[in-house]
């Protein structure tokens, strides 16, 4: 550390470091003994520190929880395998790459599926240990990798999937890529382990490594970054550690970015020292200083973030401990320049434009609704095959959206009909999807996530079906409510930016939060705790009935819940998220 312990926000330095800090220090720049574990046929998983280290390489060890008890009874270890998350800044991928990835998923993954995530990338679920090097070498051949998509690094960088404003989107996307590359770890550990298969042990090799931005112990905790183009807030910019809000010069060109910091949606049930929070405004920078600003925020979090208590290690807690003005001043000191005042911006919604839209460049873009992002051939649906068949003829690119959907982008007029034919044949275009369903989201949860407390992806379709009936009952079928289900309080389903958010508490039970907004700028308030899905539907039946009867013109469900006093707004999450009586508005910048 280069900072002094007396500096505001560093009280944690008086406490022992978390064991993860030891792990990173001793990992030989993330190599550990992973190669040794790959050769061990006695277990399907990784041992000791390697269980955590593989996360820096974009993987999590998981097992099939549906059969865990059955295997234990047979005296077998859990059916272990890995989740892999690809690094894909802005979610753009070529059809030629997709074809190879589809082949791997079918031949080598337990679930034979590809999962589109709300961080604009894809995941393989159920990859056995014996296939990991094969998988990483395939990614390398395709010009892809999975480094820094998990663990204490800057994760996959999001960028608004806006196919209409093509020039501004192109410029913003280029900065998303630049930010991603700039904040990557410099270690060759990923390549040595997964591509070259080398075992590096000597102290000389160890000393030659350098991590000028992340440091040899990397960041205190995960770090999430997004680039967003108003008025569409599809990337949920207020839920990230760092946000770059693109500002147009009025002629469709990029004038610069408003920089925000300190968003995050995870918490722990009953732990009032944890809370979700929205990101706060730091200021404006011209495009040429965007990387400087990104590095300054990251290194401030690197040096001031809590390395003793991982539950209070994200950037939002660092800002709370330092104070926003002190945090901003430290970032400006590291940038070597002050921020300019924030330029005006406004969000009007978050949903994707499902169906065909025409860009200003004359190309067409088809956004396909993919429920919970799951592409798989099962239950009479062939969604995975449908995307594969489109990939075989598509001359443009694919864009994974932050709403877990897929855009078939840059389609020529002459190719529209054939692509739509394939999409309809394989069920990728449906006429029975309500606006409510289009604006719903879930995390994966059971059976693969080890942190899951309740179902999410597997119950979302039926839950939304029941909610659709309630909407129809009250005459609101043409409207929507942003609804999200997450299986635990870690926040992967971004329920803490929903109008209706369900957070798993135990098997079959959830906490019900309401009062977020359609634009994604307000955290919902806890309304009912530890209740079942039927109980939640009964509560929502009553609330939606009131909304239908008493709402103002154009008023969303979340705004209605706040205006009518059903719940108090979360105004200052560190103070009032757990105690609504303390809800008092504060300055956000």
Swiss-Prot record:
What does the record list as GO biological process? cysteine biosynthetic process; hydrogen sulfide biosynthetic process; sulfate assimilation
Q: Which domain of life is it from?
A: Bacteria
Q: Known catalysed reaction(s)?
A: hydrogen sulfide + 3 NADP(+) + 3 H2O = sulfite + 3 NADPH + 4 H(+)
Q: What does the entry's cofactor note say about binding and number?
A: Binds 1 siroheme per subunit.
Keywords for the protein's UniProt record, in alphabetical order: 4Fe-4S, Amino-acid biosynthesis, Cysteine biosynthesis, Heme, Iron, Iron-sulfur, Metal-binding, NADP, Oxidoreductase
Q: In which pathway does it act?
A: Sulfur metabolism; hydrogen sulfide biosynthesis; hydrogen sulfide from sulfite (NADPH route): step 1/1
Q: Name one GO cellular component term.
A: sulfite reductase complex (NADPH)
- Cite the Pfam families for this sequence: NIR_SIR, NIR_SIR_ferr
Instruction: Tell me the residue numbers annotated for binding siroheme.
Output: 492
Write the protein's name: Sulfite reductase [NADPH] hemoprotein beta-component
Family to which the UniProt record says this protein belongs: Belongs to the nitrite and sulfite reductase 4Fe-4S domain family.
Organism lineage reads as: Bacteria, Pseudomonadati, Pseudomonadota, Betaproteobacteria, Neisseriales
EC number(s) in its UniProt entry? 1.8.1.2
> What is the stated purpose of this protein?
Component of the sulfite reductase complex that catalyzes the 6-electron reduction of sulfite to sulfide. This is one of several activities required for the biosynthesis of L-cysteine from sulfate.
State its cofactor: siroheme; [4Fe-4S] cluster
| Residue positions binding [4Fe-4S] cluster | 443, 449, 488, 492
């Amino acid at each position: 550390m280069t900072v002094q312990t007396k500096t505001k926000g560093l009280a944690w330095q008086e406490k022992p470091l978390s064991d993860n800090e030891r792990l990173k220090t001793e990992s030989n720049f993330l190599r550990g003994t992973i190669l040794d574990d790959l050769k061990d046929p006695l277990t399907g998983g990784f041992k000791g520190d390697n269980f955590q280290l593989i996360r820096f390489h974009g993987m999590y060890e998981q097992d099939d929880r549906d059969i865990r008890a059955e295997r234990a009874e047979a005296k077998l270890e859990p059916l272990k395998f890995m989740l892999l998350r690809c690094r894909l800044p802005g979610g753009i991928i070529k059809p030629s790459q997709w074809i190879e990835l589809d082949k791997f998923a079918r031949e080598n993954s337990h679930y034979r599926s590809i999962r589109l995530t709300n961080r604009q990338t894809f995941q393989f679920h159920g990859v056995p240990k014996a296939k990991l090097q094969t998988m990483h070498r395939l990614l390398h051949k395709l010009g892809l990798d999975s480094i820094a998509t998990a663990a204490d690094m800057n994760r996959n960088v999001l960028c608004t999937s806006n196919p209409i404003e093509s020039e501004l989107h192109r410029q913003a996307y280029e900065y998303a890529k630049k930010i991603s590359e700039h904040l990557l770890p410099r270690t060759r550990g990923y390549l040595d382990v997964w591509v070259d298969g080398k075992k590096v042990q000597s102290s000389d090799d160890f000393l030659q490594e350098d991590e000028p931005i992340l440091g040899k112990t990397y960041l205190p905790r995960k770090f999430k970054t997004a680039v967003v183009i108003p008025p569409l807030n599809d990337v949920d910019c207020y839920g990230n550690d760092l946000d770059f809000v693109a500002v147009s010069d009025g002629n469709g060109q990029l004038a610069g970015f408003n920089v925000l910091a300190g968003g995050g949606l995870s918490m722990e049930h009953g732990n009032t020292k944890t809370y979700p929070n929205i990101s706060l405004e730091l200021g404006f920078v011209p495009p040429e200083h965007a990387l400087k600003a990104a590095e300054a925020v990251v290194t401030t979090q690197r040096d001031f973030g809590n390395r003793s208590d991982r539950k209070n290690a994200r950037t939002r807690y660092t800002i709370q401990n330092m104070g926003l003005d002190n945090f901003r001043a430290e970032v400006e000191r590291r940038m070597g320049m002050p921020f300019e005042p924030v330029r005006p911006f406004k969000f009007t919604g978050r949903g994707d434009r499902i169906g065909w839209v025409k860009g200003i460049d004359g190309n067409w873009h088809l956004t396909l609704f993919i429920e919970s992002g799951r592409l798989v051939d099962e239950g009479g649906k062939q969604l995975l095959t449908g995307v594969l068949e489109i990939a075989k003829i598509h001359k443009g690119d694919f864009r994974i959206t932050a709403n877990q959907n897929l855009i078939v982008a840059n389609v020529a007029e002459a190719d529209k009909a054939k692509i739509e034919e394939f999409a309809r044949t394989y069920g990728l275009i449906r006429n029975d999807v309500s606006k409510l369903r289009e604006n719903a989201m879930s995390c994966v949860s059971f059976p693969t996530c080890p942190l899951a407390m309740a179902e999410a992806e597997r119950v979302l379709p039926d839950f939304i079906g029941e909610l659709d009936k309630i909407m129809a009952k009250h005459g609101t079928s043409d409207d929507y409510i942003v609804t999200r289900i997450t299986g635990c309080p870690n926040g992967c389903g971004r329920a803490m930016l929903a109008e209706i958010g369900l957070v798993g508490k135990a098997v079959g039970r959830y906490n019900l939060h309401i009062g977020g907004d359609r634009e994604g700028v307000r955290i919902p308030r806890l309304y009912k705790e530890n209740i079942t899905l039927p109980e939640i539907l009964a509560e929502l039946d009553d609330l939606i009935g009131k909304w239908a009867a008493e709402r103002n013109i154009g008023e969303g469900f979340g705004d209605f819940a706040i205006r009518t006093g059903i719940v108090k707004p979360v105004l200052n999450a560190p103070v009032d998220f757990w105690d609504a009586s303390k809800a008092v508005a504060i300055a956000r910048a």
